[in-house]
């Protein structure tokens, strides 16, 4: 939903995936704003294929570009996004393959360019990990997630220089 001229506009879908879930999804969308773009990242299941998508708006949310599929393997979701600059985001997400579940990040530009994934950590795919959180502060990328070790929930974190991504 957008607010223009002090009035709320009629809500519009970022993209109509056609996904229906009977219950409360763990995966909600995440949005980020730069001085010229809005980006939304979300988990969906499209024709039986779990996906993580990103879509950019260059019109202050009036319309969104065709979604860009992010995941390479089986998506779990748990998405977070932040803008690196006006044209590029970092997206964090979880996906799994035959060897386990992983927390990964990618850089995505509003022109559709996608970086190779960076694996941050092997991670438990269950709900106990929560939703990993991503922030960019002074050109440094911070990721924090929950792990269950030694009978306790603990936080793990990593700091990356955004210039090296």
Language model feature labels by segment:
Residues 1-165:
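Extracellular, repeat-based ectodomains that mediate carbohydrate processing or recognition
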């Amino acid at each position: 939903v957008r607010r223009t001229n002090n009035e709320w506009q009629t809500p519009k879908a970022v993209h109509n995936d056609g996904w229906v879930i009977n219950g409360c999804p763990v995966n909600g969308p995440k949005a980020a704003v730069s001085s010229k773009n809005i980006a939304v990242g979300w988990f969906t299941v499209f024709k039986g294929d779990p996906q993580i998508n990103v879509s950019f708006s260059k019109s202050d949310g009036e319309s969104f570009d065709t979604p860009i599929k992010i995941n390479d393997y089986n998506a779990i979701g748990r998405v977070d996004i932040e803008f690196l600059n006006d044209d590029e985001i970092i997206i964090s997400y979880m996906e799994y393959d035959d060897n386990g579940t992983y927390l990964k990040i990618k850089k995505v530009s509003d022109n559709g360019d996608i970086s190779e994934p960076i694996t941050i950590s092997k991670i438990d795919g269950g709900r106990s990990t929560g939703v990993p959180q991503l922030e960019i502060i002074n050109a440094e990328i911070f990721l924090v997630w929950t792990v269950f070790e030694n009978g306790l929930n603990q936080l793990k974190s990593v700091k990356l220089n955004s210039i090296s991504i």
